[in-house]
């Protein structure tokens, strides 16, 4: 009887230890909160699409129904020291030049603007060495496009 209680007690301690380690691992591996859209495009612009820059931030595509323009901004999850960032936007059909912003920034790159009423757009951005691009999206509506992580 004592032996079975000792084994049961050891098993309970082992399970408790594993549960504690699992909790500690989960807590320490918590991801950084995703960057929220910061309103950098100005009043009247609403987020119509976004794509994460893995572990670093988010690129937001916004649109103003009043002006008919798209706007893109790349936002870091955790602002801090200056790091290389860029953001870009162009018409998928090649009817416009690329508009972009790049440099060493503490929190976001952009905004960049392009008339977008009824056209598909290519857009994306980067934070440090992690980049993402979306091709052929939105086309005058809320549509996902093709996402490429680099």
Language-model segments: residues:
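Secretory targeting and sorting signals
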Residues: 1-29
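Post-signal peptide N-terminal regions of Sec-secreted extracellular proteins
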Residues: 29-150
């Amino acid at each position: 009887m004592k032996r079975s209680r000792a084994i049961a007690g050891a098993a309970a301690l082992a399970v408790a230890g594993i549960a504690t380690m699992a909790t500690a691992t989960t807590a320490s591996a918590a991801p950084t909160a995703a960057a929220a859209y910061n309103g950098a495009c100005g009043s009247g612009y609403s987020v119509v699409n976004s794509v994460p820059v893995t572990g670093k931030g988010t690129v937001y595509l916004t649109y103003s129904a009043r002006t008919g323009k798209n706007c893109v901004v790349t936002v870091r999850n955790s602002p801090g020291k200056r790091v290389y960032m860029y953001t870009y936007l162009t018409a998928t059909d090649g009817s416009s030049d690329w508009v972009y912003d790049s440099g060493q920034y503490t929190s976001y790159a952009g905004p960049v603007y392009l008339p977008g009423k009824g056209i598909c757009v290519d857009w994306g951005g980067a934070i440090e060495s992690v980049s993402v691009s979306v091709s052929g999206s939105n086309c005058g509506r809320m549509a996902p496009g093709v996402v490429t992580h680099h």
